[in-house]
């Protein structure tokens, strides 16, 4: 997690110290640019037969697991990985535990895409009434009619972008205080900090992997990141309750970005450490299904070295996510998200099966040929260049870069000039950023101790 944190910090510093007309893209675009020397190998996505039965039936899940073992044998594999969302993973886990010998060569994984959606809802639930909802509406980042979908994790792309912008805005506010804090407590380090910011111009002017690696490896950045880490610790524990509460937002979004980065870069260790950070929050906010089965998932993954070393090697090589685009070095996505964008998208029909027939034999035929129809549809789209374009991620487009910068500045303006800056040392009580209403002692205790309560529940569940 520390390497991911340093990369995110450097991104924020580069964005903050770029030219007056912002030229450095937001989080995803920046990481694409600083991985320009990485070799990209596109993965092939295959379409499997469709089972004409309710997905949530235990018999259906059992059939999926059985078919997976048949595929393993056909491909002469030692073991095979099957990815489910939480609802199906719970049933599959129960079946595997009941028939351990039969399914000993099968490894179950929890879908990362659906896990992210759940964590987005946890973040929204914790912060929406503390001022987050009002801030993103007032700043114009999210329209009032769309804000519920963002905070509940249903509007995935908008939610991710919203939290990236809020995360960057809060870090910029923290950096304002960091400069004065450094002058007061670490005057002897001021020349090193100034030297780093002077050298940062090279990365601002030429955002590429070579410059990025050189900056990360520099002693001056190591010292700046250490100092900023100390200042963030002060904001968490020595700057009042309001600062502590909103630093938990920064930490939660840091975890969210770590989970995204783990999938996009194929970093298995970062993926596991991010999941372990999410579990206590699921316990704290009563998302018990994910809390229980993510705990089981972490336990299973921690024993892969003894039980399935071949699978562990495959996952460490990035096999737990899928490279859909051959031009994007930061473009791997979770397996369950890949299914949403390929299999589900190509298999669906207008109105479902009821849209063309209610006759059982016709519906049965529809499902029997679904894999072939979907495969041919995907090939036809590729031939006709439907949904195809020369690669340029939208975060790299000048209009999006300008819009992102404008939205970040708008959030900062709302917090500094209209409402409350959560890192203001004069604000010691836990209050709503937009209304200034002080939380009751019971509410303060619940909010500030939420993660500790979640960690205790997680420990009790494991024991």
Predicted regions and their residues:
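Long, low-complexity intrinsically disordered regions enriched in Ser/Thr/Asp/Glu with frequent Gly/Pro
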Residues: 1-463
